[in-house]
């Protein structure tokens, strides 16, 4: 195999590290931040040269699809990573109309998701769930289901067909959607439609 420059070696090492840590490769932006390259086109250029030299293989039809080749081969199979749809914003404050169009996809390890075809992600807007560790801008991982147990965090549609993330309680003659923010009041409803249960949270620390 053709020898690599120091920058190319740094990029290859970072890709290997992230695959071993997370089960899927880093984004172009993450690679750039790790090796000190501000331009995504420069990162793409280095990836192309790594591919030409036989160190990696890319699939242009899939995001983050990088396969490490050579002696330290690390395969990322289609079974090991699931492209989970991000379906728009949902409020964690005042309810807003649910947006169901898929904005993009986010790779998650298949091992942490059961029934991957029934999982989606939503971006949180608001601060009503901060005491549960869910903050404005976070992505929540949601498993589609139409029922919930008391105390579970759900994505629910209100009587006005608006979506919100709250803790679910079924009480005597009503439903209570409880925020996890002591300064806010619960939402009391006669009827509520559960879209899914929140099973995880992703936060970008950069």
Curated annotation (Swiss-Prot):
**UniProt record similarity statement:** Belongs to the peptidase S24 family.
Q: Which domain of life is it from?
A: Bacteria
Cite the entry's keywords alphabetically.
Answer: Autocatalytic cleavage, DNA damage, DNA repair, DNA replication, DNA-binding, Hydrolase, Repressor, SOS response, Transcription, Transcription regulation
> Where the record puts its DNA-binding region(s)?
28-48
Reactions mediated catalytically: Hydrolysis of Ala-|-Gly bond in repressor LexA
Q: Species name for this entry?
A: Bacillus cytotoxicus (strain DSM 22905 / CIP 110041 / 391-98 / NVH 391-98)
UniProt entry tagged with the keyword DNA repair: yes
UniProt cross-references to InterPro entries, sorted A to Z = ArsR-like_HTH (IPR011991), LexA (IPR006200), LexA-like (IPR039418), LexA/Signal_pep-like_sf (IPR036286), LexA_DNA-bd_dom (IPR006199), LexA_repressor (IPR050077), Peptidase_S24_LexA (IPR006197), Peptidase_S24_S26A/B/C (IPR015927)
Q: Where is this site: Cleavage?
A: 92-93
Q: Which HAMAP family match?
A: LexA
Q: Which residues form the active site?
A: 128 (for autocatalytic cleavage activity), 166 (for autocatalytic cleavage activity)
Q: Name one Pfam family in it.
A: Peptidase_S24
Q: How does it assemble?
A: Homodimer.
Designated name of the protein: LexA repressor
- What biological function has been recorded for the protein in this entry? Represses a number of genes involved in the response to DNA damage (SOS response), including recA and lexA. In the presence of single-stranded DNA, RecA interacts with LexA causing an autocatalytic cleavage which disrupts the DNA-binding part of LexA, leading to derepression of the SOS regulon and eventually DNA repair.
User: Which EC number(s) does the record attach to this protein?
Assistant: 3.4.21.88
- The yes or no answer to whether the keyword DNA damage is present is yes
Molecular-function GO term, any one:
serine-type endopeptidase activity
Q: Which GO terms describe its biological process?
A: DNA repair; DNA replication; negative regulation of DNA-templated transcription; proteolysis; SOS response
